[in-house]
């Protein structure tokens, strides 16, 4: 899949939410949620980013780490806001709380949501670490008992272990989002994701932001979170080539080392995304291709109502002074 060449490139990005979209510009971040047939709720979100607190995180590689953390913080705030508004508007059904849930609410009150989110985050991180770091290493060690080329601790074994682990991580990641795409609510989120990309492309092509103009745009964008995740996994394969099969003679340390080097994968992946977004040549097309292919899963064709929400969010964050434009072609 080839990249689409646009007349200009914007720094504006966003994310799909529950019945809505968040758009983030250089001066403003806005969440827009569909709350009725002809109603769109809009609210700005304020957040101090890590680079604003510490100039050091504006440097290459470090800015990728900061960007990922800030994106996760912003996505959480946006998602909670969109979920609340969608439930209030009846766009998403709210189930009757169980006796246990009522007891928890009486016991912890307003702190309940924070407690649940912290608990869920800890469990989620633990599962992710087990699946993406320790499981691939464990399965490779099992395979090494029957695959001769996997055996030993030399350069050949390191190469195959890195490739094996990396490919398995990509399969797990793609399998996860394929399963998510089968859920009704996630299908709609992926449709809003498509609307977000199409709207950004429409703006970059210097076309008026109308439903008709947005609808005809392509939904695969090189500066997407999906592409970033895929690039991180690929960079992780390369980094794995420099980690011994059993550091200091202890096989358990290899996944630990890979976890410690995760910020490097994040930083390099971020820089590659920025390069792919600014330049269109054979090199960047090769780098961007895996992420664009993965977007066939994480983006779907939106309906006109979704496009209207994306346009509303986009218009809210476009600065009057053009400070969002990275370059003009």
Predicted feature locations:
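Hydrophobic alpha-helical segments characteristic of transmembrane helices
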Residues: 92-147, 157-183
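Low-complexity, intrinsically disordered, cysteine-poor segments enriched in small/polar
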Residues: 64-71, 75-78, 82, 145, ...
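Juxtamembrane "helix exit" motif at the C-terminal ends of alpha-helical transmembrane segments
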Residues: 125-151, 232-257, 270
């Amino acid at each position: 899949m080839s990249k689409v060449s646009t007349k200009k490139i914007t720094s504006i990005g966003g994310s799909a939410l529950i019945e809505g979209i968040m758009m983030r510009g250089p001066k403003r971040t806005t969440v827009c949620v569909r709350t009725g047939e002809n109603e769109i709720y809009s609210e700005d979100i304020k957040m101090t980013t890590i680079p604003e607190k510490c100039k050091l995180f504006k440097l290459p590689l470090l800015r990728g780490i900061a960007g990922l953390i800030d994106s996760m913080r912003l996505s959480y705030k946006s998602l909670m806001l969109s979920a609340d508004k969608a439930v209030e508007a009846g766009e998403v059904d709210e189930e009757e709380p169980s006796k246990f849930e009522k007891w928890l609410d009486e016991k912890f009150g307003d702190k309940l949501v924070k407690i649940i989110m912290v608990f869920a985050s800890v469990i989620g991180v633990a599962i992710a670490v087990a699946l993406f770091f320790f499981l691939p290493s464990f399965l490779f060690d099992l395979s090494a008992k029957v695959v001769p080329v996997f055996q030993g601790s030399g350069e050949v074994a390191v190469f195959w272990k890195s490739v094996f682990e990396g490919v398995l991580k990509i399969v797990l990641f793609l399998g996860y989002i394929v399963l998510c795409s089968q859920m009704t609510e996630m299908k709609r989120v992926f449709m809003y994701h498509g609307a977000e990309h199409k709207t950004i492309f429409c703006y970059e092509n210097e076309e008026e932001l109308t439903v008709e103009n947005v609808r005809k745009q392509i939904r695969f964008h090189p500066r997407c979170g999906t592409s970033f995740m895929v690039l991180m996994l690929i960079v992780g394969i390369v980094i794995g080539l420099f980690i011994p099969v059993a550091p200091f003679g202890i096989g358990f340390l290899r996944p630990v080392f890979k976890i410690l080097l995760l910020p490097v994968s994040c930083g390099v992946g971020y820089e590659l995304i920025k390069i792919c977004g600014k330049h269109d040549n054979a090199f960047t097309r090769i780098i961007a291709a895996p992420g664009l292919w993965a977007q066939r899963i994480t983006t779907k064709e939106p309906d006109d109502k979704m496009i209207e929400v994306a346009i509303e969010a986009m218009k809210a964050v476009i600065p009057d002074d053009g400070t969002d434009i990275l370059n003009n072609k």
